[in-house]
């Protein structure tokens, strides 16, 4: 408001003074007083506004004419109009971003209102972070009137972002600067030429259209200059931008801008699918790129790199970055850098959790897995076994394990996940199921690291941690008895074993316990013991000179109550001569049952049955083999209970009295031959003598010197029935020999 507090700006208008309002009628007796340019009183006369008559006193102060105190309304006439007013004094707006010099008459000295709409903002990239406005402005002032140079800085740190905006007064100046500076000059301290282009939205604002083309299948070694030369033949190229990754390497695609649609169409017709760059094997892909507005505040040089193919100004959207140019269909889509393809039929073994490769595979529903008796280190990665073809009388799982151990594949027991194999899908479990069978071991000489070929509910208390605890047996002579001779104790007797398997500190006890669980395997082998006794005299002389360490005695001491010693607890050397008589014992223990069918596992993890005499293979279990297994099971059921009870009760005393057990072995003439009979040497035959070889010190590879020939031995094993055997009744009669030894050791 102008004037004192008791006054207002409006005054009665005089008839002779021009002002802001045109007279509205012919009665000049009252009205508004015109305002002068400075906001004061316009003149002495008045002009009345003709309108409705008001009967209340006027609220306006009197003018120079003392008798005028109120408005007098007249009848409104139809010639009402507004005369242009004198321009008021313009004041700078409070919300104005940048001030411009203002003259005394309220006009801009630089660019007036009409000129401001034609100002053009350019984006400049590849600006050194140390550059200042004074260093940048001279390069652009050479090509037009530069109104402003604005360096882009980080809001938090205040550091420059390596780009800036330059505002020109006219679009002609901006176009001239783009043609002269884009990819042409390098600012002091810069690493490459600057990129000069219209800022986002500037072309739309000033009404200048651009025609942008997406170009694919470019040579990744090509530069912007080389790409521009290809497109220059169709018209003036305003901009060339190559998409680059976070290492500033070209991705083989980019964008080319034309100023007219005709030149852009000509480039598409002349290059798309017809022109091939040097060093490329595919023609160029040229098409229109649909523009996409970027997020506010982001530009091509400011967007952070996102994965491969994310050059400046490209943001991650979904599986790949999307450029602000809008066309990303030509971009190479990203994939996970490492996602191993899973095979449908060959999956990780269900009983192993191999983490040596840094991954933890687990069987999934609908994904076939190798059965538990093929849980070698190669099973989880789809690698076929070295000998996928079935060999007569040789378990394929044993062959796998022999080859894996010979190749130096070492699986640490502590890395096995302690999960019960009971959780396997039923169709994927081993398919040898007997009535009342409770053993996961059915091949006493050729079992793998996991051992079971028959898994029933009573076995759920045996975790995978026990699987790699029988390493030496991997190198044993494989026989055609793939099942029916080994049984684990009943479920009630496996409860104590379960509790001792989890603590890693009790691995030694785990090894011994699993040994005891295998004792029933060789109790039915009466011919094996008798053969040992016959060969004692012939082998005793050379064996007397062979050293046996105390740990080796501990392994033999375990023989006093079982048939399989725990070599994992031996760190000494065991001569190979101890292993010479296993083949005759094995053949004779098997020959009493006339079964020529053996169970094997294919490389895909499926069970099949092979006839060693006829060479026939079947997927279904033969009736002959079922009868064979039942007969063996009946024999084992009579032998199982007393043997396991004795083995569990004497476990601790056996480990504490190696010297006493050694003497007892000498008294029973079972010292060296009995120990060796169950560890046949690869390639061993009935009457072959071998020089002594030390057993490996690593408990996981107790017979590494022998295991190297496991593959060759598997092809030369002794078939079923190679050694004759007599009636089964002698087996029952000779059972008391090892049992008496166990009771003596306990005492």
Swiss-Prot record:
Name any one GO molecular function.
RNA binding
Q: What is known of its domains?
A: The WW domain is required for autoregulation of FCA expression.
Q: Give the keywords, sorted.
A: Developmental protein, Differentiation, Flowering, Nucleus, Repeat, RNA-binding
Q: What else is known?
A: While FCA requires both FY and FLD, FPA requires FLD but not FY to repress FLC.
- Could you tell me where the Polar residues compositional bias lies? 320-353, 395-406, 461-498, 674-707, 726-739
Give the span(s) annotated as Disordered: 80-101, 291-503, 630-707, 722-747
Kindly give the PROSITE patterns that the UniProt entry links to this protein.
RRM, WW_DOMAIN_2
Known InterPro entries for this protein?
A: Nucleotide-bd_a/b_plait_sf (IPR012677), RBD_domain_sf (IPR035979), RRM1_FCA (IPR047193), RRM_dom (IPR000504), WW_dom (IPR001202), WW_dom_sf (IPR036020)
Spell out the GO cellular component terms annotated for this protein, sorted alphabetically and separated by semicolons: nucleus
Cellular localisation: Nucleus
Swiss-Prot/TrEMBL induction comment: Negative feedback mediated by FCA itself.
**One Pfam family this sequence matches:** WW
What is this protein's record name? Flowering time control protein FCA
- Origin, by domain of life? Eukaryota
- Where is composition skewed (Basic and acidic residues) in this entry? 291-301, 630-641
Q: Name one GO biological process term.
A: cell differentiation
Its annotated function is as follows:
Plays a major role in the promotion of the transition of the vegetative meristem to reproductive development. Plays a role in the regulation of flowering time in the autonomous flowering pathway by decreasing FLOWERING LOCUS C mRNA levels. Required for RNA-mediated chromatin silencing of a range of loci in the genome. Cotranscriptionally recognizes aberrant RNA and marks it for silencing. Controls alternative cleavage and polyadenylation on pre-mRNAs and antisense RNAs. Acts redundantly with FPA to prevent the expression of distally polyadenylated antisense RNAs at the FLC locus.
Q: Does the keyword RNA-binding apply?
A: yes
Q: In which tissues is this gene expressed? A: Constitutively expressed, but the negative feedback maintains the active isoform a low level throughout much of the plant, except in meristematic cells at a specific time in development.
Q: Where is the composition biased (Low complexity)?
A: 448-460, 642-673
């Amino acid at each position: 408001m102008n004037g004192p507090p008791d006054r207002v700006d409006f005054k009665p208008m005089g008839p002779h003074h021009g002002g802001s309002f045109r007279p509205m009628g012919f009665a000049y007796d009252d009205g508004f007083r015109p305002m002068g340019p400075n906001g004061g009183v316009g003149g002495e006369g008045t002009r009345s506004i003709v309108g409705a008559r008001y009967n209340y006193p006027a609220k306006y102060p009197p003018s120079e004419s003392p008798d005028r105190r109120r408005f007098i309304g007249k009848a409104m006439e139809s010639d009402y109009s507004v005369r242009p007013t004198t321009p008021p004094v313009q004041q700078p707006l409070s919300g104005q971003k940048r001030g411009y010099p203002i003259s005394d008459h309220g006009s801009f000295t630089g660019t007036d209102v009409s000129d401001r709409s034609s100002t053009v903002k350019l984006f400049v990239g590849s600006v050194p972070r140390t550059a200042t406005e004074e260093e940048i402005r001279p390069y652009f002032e050479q090509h037009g009137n530069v109104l402003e140079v604005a360096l882009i800085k980080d809001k938090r740190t205040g550091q420059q972002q390596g780009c800036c905006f330059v505002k020109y007064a006219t679009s002609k100046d901006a176009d001239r600067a783009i043609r002269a500076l884009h990819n042409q000059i390098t600012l002091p301290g810069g690493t490459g030429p600057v990129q000069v282009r219209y800022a986002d939205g500037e072309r739309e604002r000033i009404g200048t259209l651009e025609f942008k083309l997406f170009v694919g299948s470019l040579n990744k070694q090509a530069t912007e200059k080389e790409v521009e030369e290809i497109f220059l033949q169709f018209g003036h190229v305003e901009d060339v931008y190559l998409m680059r990754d976070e290492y500033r390497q070209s991705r083989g695609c980019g964008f080319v801008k034309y100023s007219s649609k005709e030149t852009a169409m000509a480039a598409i017709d002349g290059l798309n699918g017809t022109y091939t760059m040097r060093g490329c094997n595919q023609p160029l892909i040229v098409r229109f790129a649909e523009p996409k507005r970027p997020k506010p505040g982001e530009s091509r040089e400011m967007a952070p790199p996102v994965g491969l193919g994310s050059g400046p100004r490209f943001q991650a959207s979904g599986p790949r970055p999307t450029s602000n140019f809008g066309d990303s269909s030509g971009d190479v889509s990203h994939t996970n850098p490492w996602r191993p393809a899973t095979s449908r039929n060959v999956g990780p073994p269900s009983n192993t959790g191999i983490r040596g490769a840094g991954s933890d595979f687990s069987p999934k529903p609908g994904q076939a897995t190798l059965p538990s008796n093929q849980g070698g280190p190669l099973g989880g990665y789809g690698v076929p076994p070295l000998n996928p073809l079935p060999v007569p009388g040789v378990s394929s799982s044993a062959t796998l394990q022999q080859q894996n151990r010979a190749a130096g594949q070492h699986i640490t027991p502590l890395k096995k996940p302690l999960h019960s194999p009971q959780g396997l899908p039923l169709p994927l479990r081993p398919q040898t199921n007997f009535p009342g069978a409770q053993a996961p071991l059915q091949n006493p000489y050729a079992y793998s690291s996991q051992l079971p070929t028959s898994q029933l509910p009573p076995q759920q208390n045996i975790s995978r941690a026990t699987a790699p605890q029988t390493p030496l047996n991997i190198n044993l002579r494989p026989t055609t008895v793939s099942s029916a001779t080994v049984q684990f104790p009943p479920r009630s007797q496996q409860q104590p074993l379960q509790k001792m398997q989890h603590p890693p500190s009790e691995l030694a006890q785990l090894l011994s316990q699993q040994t005891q669980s295998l004792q029933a395997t060789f109790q039915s082998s009466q011919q094996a013991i008798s053969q040992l006794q016959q060969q004692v005299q012939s082998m005793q002389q050379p064996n007397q000179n062979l050293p046996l360490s105390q740990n080796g005695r501990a392994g033999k001491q375990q023989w006093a109550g079982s048939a399989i010693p725990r070599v994992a607890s031996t760190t000494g050397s065991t001569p190979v001569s101890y292993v010479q008589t296993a083949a005759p014992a094995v053949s004779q223990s098997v020959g009493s049952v006339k079964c020529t069918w053996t169970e094997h596992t294919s490389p895909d993890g499926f069970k099949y049955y092979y006839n060693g005499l006829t060479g026939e293979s079947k997927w279904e279990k033969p009736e002959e083999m079922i009868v064979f297994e039942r007969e063996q099971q009946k024999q084992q059921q009579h032998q199982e209970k007393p043997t396991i009870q004795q083995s569990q009760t004497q476990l601790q005393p056996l480990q504490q009295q190696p010297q006493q057990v050694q003497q007892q072995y000498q008294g029973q003439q079972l010292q060296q031959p009995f120990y060796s009979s169950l560890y046949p040497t690869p390639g061993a035959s009935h009457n072959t003598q071998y020089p002594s070889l030390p057993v490996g010190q690593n408990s996981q590879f107790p017979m590494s010197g022998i295991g190297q020939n496991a593959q060759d031995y598997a092809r030369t094993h002794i078939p079923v029935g190679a050694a004759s055997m007599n009636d089964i009744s002698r087996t029952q009669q000779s059972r008391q020999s090892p049992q008496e030894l166990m009771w003596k050791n306990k005492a």
